[in-house]
From Swiss-Prot:
Cofactor: binding comment: Binds 1 Mn(2+) ion per subunit.
Protein name in the entry: Phosphoenolpyruvate carboxykinase (ATP)
UniProt-listed Gene3D superfamilies: 3.90.228.20, Phosphoenolpyruvate Carboxykinase, domain 1 (3.40.449.10), Phosphoenolpyruvate Carboxykinase, domain 2 (2.170.8.10)
Subunit structure: Monomer.
Keyword annotations from UniProtKB, A to Z: Acetylation, ATP-binding, Cytoplasm, Decarboxylase, Gluconeogenesis, Lyase, Manganese, Metal-binding, Nucleotide-binding
Enzyme Commission identifier(s): 4.1.1.49
GO biological-process terms attached to the record: gluconeogenesis
Enzyme class label: lyase
Cofactor list: Mn(2+)
Family: Belongs to the phosphoenolpyruvate carboxykinase (ATP) family.
Species for this entry: Escherichia fergusonii (strain ATCC 35469 / DSM 13698 / CCUG 18766 / IAM 14443 / JCM 21226 / LMG 7866 / NBRC 102419 / NCTC 12128 / CDC 0568-73)
Compartments, record wording: Cytoplasm
């Protein structure tokens, strides 16, 4: 069998990259390990070996995505379909870019990559062969090649024989755009997409997550237009084949809660839902490591070994890691191939239709209950609201928990109007007879975060059906159905009012939060379907 290892400099000339010295094509993990630790490397290119066997790298100034530097070329392909930042009521990061400015940025990146020794990784985004993207990543930095090898689906030798990329990602992290002011851009850094050319360009930021979330944004454009749900969620499957999906923004518990020794992991962040069921977009996991401990999260801790890649953690002189140190960023991370988790769906990361849909929120106000069972209209309302507290460090400039509303629990990655995702999800849920729940992994009136132990017991009660059979009462103002008791959960925390010195204190905070919900949802009331959902939200 002949594997296409003969990618040549001529192949890269088609993208505008010239005079390439050498191409390291689909490097092995062993080769990447050597490359990352090369003592001749300088600055952010150079990795450090930790006592756990994983290499740690520093992503520079950018320790999270830079949404203000995200652009989409507005042309005939995207003009009438994309959810644009400069149109309508919704707030998003999809800023339009002219084809002329795109060509300038492309010239900067191709000039940066020309004449260099390059790493090229061919991989898939999407576990379903019918709808996956074949993506070619081009970078001059070994650890960035390692990151995409971890995070995307690694092709077999057979699949590489006739691999033809649908999408090209050119990472020019070392170059910046000096003409940004004249071009009306946000800064010298850029993360730009062209749907006509099927290409992503990166300049100025070293953060690996831009490649991961960039391809997620593209799947979020392509799949819903085919009637396939594209979801910012984790997913797992039980022994009886029962599938659960966990929606939530960064830091709300998607990775932690879906990594469950009693269930097999489908994936931890990005999934589709088609006629056959739920499938992963990725071939790896990207877990937060701040305050990580072997006791609280053994599966994730044990996944940090050779071939895992740590980002922005503090490594002591003896190679040990201080997971409690957030001085560089609270958004410390590790990427690892999904098979570093023992209990995964094999050989392909997909399963049947979901019957449990869990919305994770981290409520900084301490108003919402740890768990509530949603009606069909409440499901749509809370999906479109996407409320959480924005947690420290996943974006630049955010260091304290602040409340935020992110449509579909992932507005930063949406390419179409949020209602299109809600419509597709609801159709899939109705066909599967799925039930939705709102789970608060954040804070309560004590000012303490709800414990992982209690949250895990709540998830168990959802998955084993005991929550559906529990007696419930209704929380005023938010009209949420709350169980009176659940196995293994401290009954006192189920009603958030009980965690305050007085119910008046809860009432005061609840009114503040309810008003935020109502004001946020106003942007959906310009359609009859959106206006009809107002009744499912909080009432003052």
């Amino acid at each position: 069998m002949r594997v296409n290892k003969s990618l040549t400099p001529q192949d890269l000339m088609a993208y505008g990259i010239n005079d390439v010295q050498d191409i390291v094509y689909n490097p092995s993990y062993d080769l990447l390990f050597q490359e990352e630790l090369d003592p001749n490397l300088k600055g952010y290119e150079r990795g450090v070996l930790t006592n756990l066997g994983a290499v740690a790298v520093d992503t520079g100034v950018f320790t999270g995505r830079s949404p203000k530097d995200k652009y989409i070329v507005r042309d005939d392909t995207t003009r009438d379909t994309f959810w644009w930042a400069d149109k309508g009521k919704g707030k998003n990061d999809n800023k339009p870019l002219s084809p002329e400015t795109w060509q300038h940025l492309k010239g900067l990146v191709t000039n940066q990559l020309s004449g260099k020794r390059l790493f090229v990784v061919d991989a898939f985004c999407g576990a379903n062969a019918d709808t996956r993207l074949s993506v070619r990543f081009i970078t001059e930095v070994a650890w960035q090649a390692h990151f995409v090898k971890n995070m995307f689906i690694r092709p077999t030798d057979e699949e590489l024989v006739d691999f033809e990329p649908d999408f090209i990602v050119m990472n020019g992290a070392k170059c910046t755009n000096p003409q940004w002011k004249e071009q009306g851009l946000n800064s010298e850094n850029f993360v730009a997409f062209n749907l006509t050319e099927r290409m992503q360009l990166i300049g100025g930021t070293w953060y690996g997550g831009e490649m991961k979330k960039g391809m997620f944004s593209m799947m979020n454009y392509l799949l819903p237009l085919k009637g396939i749900a594209s979801m910012h969620c984790s997913a797992n499957v039980g022994e009886k084949g029962d599938v659960a999906v966990f929606f939530g923004l960064s830091g709300t518990g998607k990775t932690t809660l879906s990594t469950d020794p009693k269930r097999r992991l489908i994936g931890d962040d990005e999934h589709g839902w088609d006629d056959d069921g739920v499938f992963n977009f990725e071939g790896g996991c990207y877990a937060k490591t701040i305050k990580l401990s072997k006791e609280a999260e053994p599966e994730i801790y044990n996944a940090i070994r050779r071939d895992a890649l740590l980002e922005n953690v503090t490594v002591r002189e003896d190679g040990t890691i201080d997971f409690d140190d957030g001085s560089k960023t609270e958004n410390t991370r590790v990427s690892y191939p999904i098979y570093h988790i023992d209990n995964i769906v094999k050989p392909v990361s997909k399963a049947g239709h979901a019957t449990k849909v869990i919305f994770l929120t981290a409520d900084a106000f301490g108003v919402l209950p740890p768990v509530s069972r949603l009606t069909a209209d409440q499901t749509q309302y809370h999906f479109l609201s996407g409320f959480t507290a924005k947690l420290a460090g996943t974006e630049r400039g955010i260091t304290e928990p602040t409340p935020t509303f992110s449509a579909c629990f992932g507005a930063a990655f949406l390419s179409l109007h949020p209602t299109q995702y809600a419509e597709v999800l609801v159709k899939r849920m109705q066909a599967a007879g799925a039930q939705a729940y709102l789970v608060n992994t954040g804070w309560n009136g004590t000012g303490k975060r709800i414990s992982i132990k209690d949250t895990r017991a709540i998830i168990d009660a959802i998955l084993n059906g005991s929550l559906d059979n529990a007696e419930t009462f209704t929380l005023p103002m938010f009209n949420l159905a709350i169980p009176t008791e659940l196995p293994g959960v401290d009954t006192k925390i189920l009603d958030p009012r009980n965690t305050y010195a007085s119910s008046e204190q809860w009432q005061e905070k609840a009114e503040t939060l309810a008003k935020l919900f109502i004001d946020n949802f106003d942007k959906y009331t310009d359609t009859p379907a959106g206006a009809a959902l107002v009744e499912a939200g909080p009432k003052l």
